[in-house]
Amino acid sequence: MFNKVERLSPNISGKQKKKKQIILTNTGRDVEEYLTSLKYRMNGKFKRVPHYIVTKDGNVIQTLPDETYSNYFTEPNINRNSIIVSFENLGWLEKVPLKDYYTNWIGNIYKGSAYEKKWRDYFLWEPYTEIQMQS
C-alpha cells in the first residue's frame, strides 16, 4: 500500500535534477513515534526528513516529493542527488544483561530475535520484515 502524507518539513528545496542514488536508513523507532518526531521536533522545522518510509507491514509512506530534497545529511550534494528511504526499524541493539530483551539507542525495548552483523562498534540489529523487503 502506498500513502502520501502532508509535507513534514518546510526545510525542503525546490525542484532539482534527476536523482543519482537511493540511500536506505532506519527510523530508530516505530513509525507513529517517528512521524510524530518529524512533525513536531523543533516546531516543525526538523530538517532530516526521508522521501519514503517503509513500515513493518509493508506500507510505503511518501513524505516528500521525489524532485525535492531535505537536509537529511550534512553534505549538500548527497541531499540534492539522493532519494532517502527509511525503514521502520529500531536499528542497532544492545542486549540487556540478565534479561530476555534488547534496547536501541533511545531505549526502545525489542523482544524478538536479533540479527548479528558487525558494523562499526555495533553487533546486533533488529531484522527487517519480509514484507518490508518486498515493498
Question: Where do the model's predicted regions map?
Answer:
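Active-site-adjacent loop/helix surface patches within enzyme catalytic domains
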Residues: 2-135
